[in-house]
Regions:
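Von Willebrand factor
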Residues: 40-107, 116-163, 190-203, 207, ...
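Von Willebrand factor A/integrin I-like adhesion domains
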Residues: 193-251
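DG-centered beta-turn motif at the end of beta-strands
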Residues: 51-52, 144, 156-170, 216
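VWA/integrin I-like adhesion module and closely mimicked acidic/polar interface patches used
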Residues: 81, 167-214
């Protein structure tokens, strides 16, 4: 799809999103019951959870971050923002690796126009890059869930946007962790990064997109946007963020993970770690 075709597709999605938001938004969603009356009303509270495990090499880390930075300053993002019921979103950005290794790069910020979007993009861009051991998607999801508790915002929707290039291999099992997040009324979307060809003895896997679909994502409108080519990295990240702000999902629809039997073992990451290291450091519950 060319750039013009992509813009046309996104514009169509945003038009549909405006109608959907007007029809489906309620003044007091259930998850807002415990929020302070002084909290600011926004269309979505969005947590961006970014994998920085050692399997993420610099050629993956840089476009991963750049994709979010460019998305926040794009005209498609601004259009999605304007179409919302409140024309505002709240966003925070953190990096994750092992079970207890999470670092907030940018705390909760309000985006309500180009100026605040630029400020957020600049804040993310200014953070130094880092890498760390292990891949605990479950640890990242658990941490992300807690961030909503004191965000200071009333979101009509709450979304975790998790990106990574491997399966869970540390901390609690990912499925019960995911289900715990979904019970709280939070949607999980995925950005599986599939740039490397899997080789024996590595932690890379061929069907990471299927793993994300069946074991990681869930909730109303949950979807994945796989990245298989470096040239598509920024475009895919931008499209995903625009869809999340608009409250829509791409076609064909991905059925939320909780409503279908997994097509892949959701403990494959733990199994791969055990095969490689003989169970050393395998601390999942």
């Amino acid at each position: 799809m060319g750039r013009r075709g992509l813009y046309s597709a996104i514009a169509s999605v945003l038009t549909a999103a405006a109608c959907a938001l007007a029809a489906s938004a309620t003044p007091n969603p259930p998850h807002l019951a415990d929020k302070s009356p002084s909290a600011i009303a926004v269309d979505v509270e969005l947590v961006i959870a970014v994998d920085v495990s050692y399997s993420m090499d610099p050629d993956e880390q840089a476009p991963q971050r750049e994709g979010y930075i460019m998305a926040l300053t794009s005209r498609e993002f601004m259009q999605a923002l304007r179409e919302g019921a409140n024309s505002k979103i709240a966003i925070t950005y953190f990096e994750w690796a092992g079970q207890f290794d999470q670092k907030i790069i940018m705390p909760w910020r309000l985006i309500e126009g180009p100026e605040s979007a630029d400020a957020v993009a600049n804040e993310i861009a200014a953070a130094p890059y880092r890498r760390a051991s292990r891949t605990s998607i479950s640890g990242g999801l658990t941490f992300a869930k807690t961030l909503f508790d004191h965000s200071g915002y009333h979101g009509l929707r709450r979304v975790i946007d998790v990106s990574g290039d491997g399966a869970n291999n540390a901390g609690p099992l990912v499925v019960p962790t995911r289900d715990d997040v979904l019970v709280a009324g939070i949607t999980i979307n995925g950005l599986p990064i599939m740039l490397k060809r899997p080789y024996p003895g590595t932690m890379d896997m061929e069907n990471l997109d299927v793993y994300y679909e069946d074991c990681v994502i869930g909730g109303p409108g949950a979807f994945v946007v796989p990245i298989r080519e470096r040239a598509k990295f920024i475009e895919a990240t931008r499209t995903k963020l625009v869809l999340e702000v608009a409250g829509r999902q791409p076609e064909p629809r991905v059925i939320p993970a909780s409503s279908q039997a997994p097509r892949i073992s959701c403990t494959i990451g733990e199994k791969m770690w055990q095969d490689r290291w003989g169970g050393r450091g395998l601390d999942f519950q």
